[in-house]
Amino acid sequence: MDYFNIKQNYYTGNFVQCLQEIEKFSKVTDNTLLFYKAKTLLALGQYQSQDPTSKLGKVLDLYVQFLDTKNIEELENLLKDKQNSPYELYLLATAQAILGDLDKSLETCVEGIDNDEAEGTTELLLLAIEVALLNNNVSTASTIFDNYTNAIEDTVSGDNEMILNLAESYIKFATNKETATSNFYYYEELSQTFPTWKTQLGLLNLHLQQRNIAEAQGIVELLLSDYYSVEQKENAVLYKPTFLANQITLALMQGLDTEDLTNQLVKLDHEHAFIKHHQEIDAKFDELVRKYDTSN
């Protein structure tokens, strides 16, 4: 089956269109359709149990339950038999990463990538790259990517090639490689071909990385326009925390006050990685001040 349009819309953040593509196969049942439908509904805040009779359906339900409770025990128990599909391991690894257990999450990803079942391994590879980069293991991310692509180079389908390109772009971004050439052109083309919040934010990050302040400001103003803020209001809500973090970064580069933007982000998502990172920096600074405060 051809999943290209489904995955294309999902990974460019066009979730409404992704659902429409999935509905074209309403008479077909398979794990890929179930996985992407559930993940898309979850992104839109519209999740409902899809197939509680199948193992993947049960795993999806327990994963959504975990997102609410942050209790991973039931999810782990269901998957302890080691006979799990890549999609099922994807959900477990994501839950482990959310809890901050990045090493264990990466182990789960690798277990699934080495699985004999091909369906879902490319998605799991992308997650492995994301987890490794979050854990500041750039060399690990590069090694996993190279090993995987070398092993399957003659059998890559179009829909999976798209995921591999995305994974490679993350590694290039993290290593600051080709930021003004191929990686930049990749995101520029995506944002022009699929003008969504996710693609524009990707391009915005590339401009911020290169300190292209005028171009970054242009994308901020574009995302504040009616086309994005009104006509794509579901995505506007979904990507608001990321957008605020980018706006704060840009404002700092411009020497502008960031208090209002920061307060908005804290109110919207006080656990956001940007906020936690700056809280850690502030804590270290305060510790240094106390250490060298000669008045004590």
From Swiss-Prot:
Q: Which superkingdom is the protein from?
A: Eukaryota
**Membrane topology, as annotated:** Peripheral membrane protein
Q: Which GO terms describe its cellular component?
A: COPI vesicle coat; Golgi membrane
UniProt record, GO biological process: endoplasmic reticulum to Golgi vesicle-mediated transport; intra-Golgi vesicle-mediated transport; late endosome to vacuole transport via multivesicular body sorting pathway; protein transport; retrograde vesicle-mediated transport, Golgi to endoplasmic reticulum; vesicle coating
Which InterPro entries does this entry report, sorted A to Z?
Coatomer_esu (IPR006822), TPR-like_helical_dom_sf (IPR011990)
Checking PANTHER family in the record gives: COATOMER SUBUNIT EPSILON (PTHR10805:SF0)
Protein name per Swiss-Prot or TrEMBL: Coatomer subunit epsilon
